Amino acid sequence: MAGQQALLLFGFILPGLLFSEAAKILTVSLVGGSHFLLMHQISQILQDHGHNVTMLLQKGNLLLPGFKEEEKSYKVFNWFLPEDCNEEFKRSFHSFMEKTFGGRCKFEHFLNIMELLGHHCSHLLRRKDVMKSLKNENFDLVIVEMFDYCPFLVAEKLGKPFVAILPSALGTVDFGLPSPLSYVPVFYSLLTDQMDFWGRVKNFLMFFEFFKKQWKIQSAYDDTIKEHFPDDSRPVLSHLLTKAELWFVNTDFAFDFARPLLPNTVCIGGLMSKPVKPVPQEFENFITKFGDSGFVLVSLGSMVSFIRSQEVLKEMNAAFAHLPQGVIWKYNPSHWPKDIKLAPNVKIVHWLPQNDLLGHPRIRLFVSHGGMNSIMEAIQHGVPMVGIPLFGDQHENLLRVKAKKFGVSIQLKQIKAETLALKMKQVIEDKRYKSAAEAASIIRRSQPLTPAQRLVGWINHILQTGGAAHLKPHAFQQPWYEQYLLDVFLFLLVVTLGTMWLCGKLLGLVARWLCGARKLKKA
């Protein structure tokens, strides 16, 4: 078995070894937090495999407090957003987070964020010095991340082939995948792949709601496109999505629901996972105090360094106090309210080595916001979860965690000390959750190629072949009515109705002839 895997691996990476000439690759990172971390990892992996990688990095709004920038060997091309725009975005984002913690966040608030990102894109494309420098580099390939649409417009402006990274689960954006509505849940339908009749009715209706929201998000970039692209060559954002040579998706079927994929779609969930290192001594000393009871890791993501609702904070702190385990909580100590006494079994830290703590033998539970990178790391190490979704794709992610039976979730507005403590004890004490998490880990780990090998292998493949036209279906060139055979149905309907009309006419003629013949006979 090991020999077969080695042979498969060698056969897959051989073309990359033969492709000895290093390619010039541009990666575009315009959003912070986990989005930057994923693009950093992709850039570093490709650099380590012999390519010359440059990252276009928007400084000022992404290296969040507490993030320790790792050493990197790829080049960085920095650009700075005007300070007033940066401050406006920070105010809007803080307002968005306050509404999230207050349970008042709506799609319109997210749309406001996307509109600001559209304005930021205009500022970038307006920077002739930046765009000229990038054009002069003559990159072979651009790698863009699908959180907002600006990276796609940058690649289009440079006139270079591009590869897209989807940082979330499948289905969060439509880039042409077949999606049978009978078992592929629409994003934000909060359905699984096992739908009853009413579930399928809901999924069908949510399909139209999903496309309406996608259209609104894409419309936020209309002014940017009109300003920076001439009338005769203005890109349509939905068409740009299908123009990508490859789509790398930050998911894995150990987590996601099985569904059809296209040949140019590659799952790389787990790309952020790294070999486990010993945790720093301060963490080890804290963990040791709780012996075999172990510890619980709490992190609500790279974009949440503190909780803006004191009520939620009190309830979470009280819930942790009910546990016999120690609790290591990623929370900025300088923001801890003075009137709330920290539970004696809780350690709060501004930064923590999440991957190493998840790989620690004494970890018992991971309390997470449900971000994809965090979930993939938890699956890698077989750690069960309690999820507290905040916004974006996190509700859908944690629905999948629950469906796969290696965790549960609780809504932010439902958090009470007793309820949260009960959920955590349930997952820690019921060994079925741990078993399901370990089963998912085996599925993730036992695949023939690692996520990094898939990434590098497919990038090298399209560099060798000059693109991925051979991996894209002709459907991308067809109008929508051809894809759904509406012209065929219309033709068959016309033929059927025409035939019925003609048959009716003929029957009428025959009936009149027979009636006429009877009258003549009687006469």
From Swiss-Prot:
Keywords: Glycoprotein, Glycosyltransferase, Membrane, Signal, Transferase, Transmembrane, Transmembrane helix. Residues 1-22 form the signal peptide. It catalyses: glucuronate acceptor + UDP-alpha-D-glucuronate = acceptor beta-D-glucuronoside + UDP + H(+). CDD domains: GT1_Gtf-like. It is a single-pass type I membrane protein. GO terms for cellular component: UDP-N-acetylglucosamine transferase complex. UDP-glucuronosyltransferases catalyze phase II biotransformation reactions in which lipophilic substrates are conjugated with glucuronic acid to increase water solubility and enhance excretion. They are of major importance in the conjugation and subsequent elimination of potentially toxic xenobiotics and endogenous compounds. This is UDP-glucuronosyltransferase 3A1. Residues 23-483 are extracellular. Its main location: membrane. InterPro entries: UDP-glycosyltransferase, UDP_glucos_trans, UDP_glycos_trans_CS. Glycans are attached at N52. GO terms for molecular function: glucuronosyltransferase activity. Its EC number is 2.4.1.17. The chain crosses the membrane at residues 484-504. Belongs to the UDP-glycosyltransferase family. It is found in: Membrane.
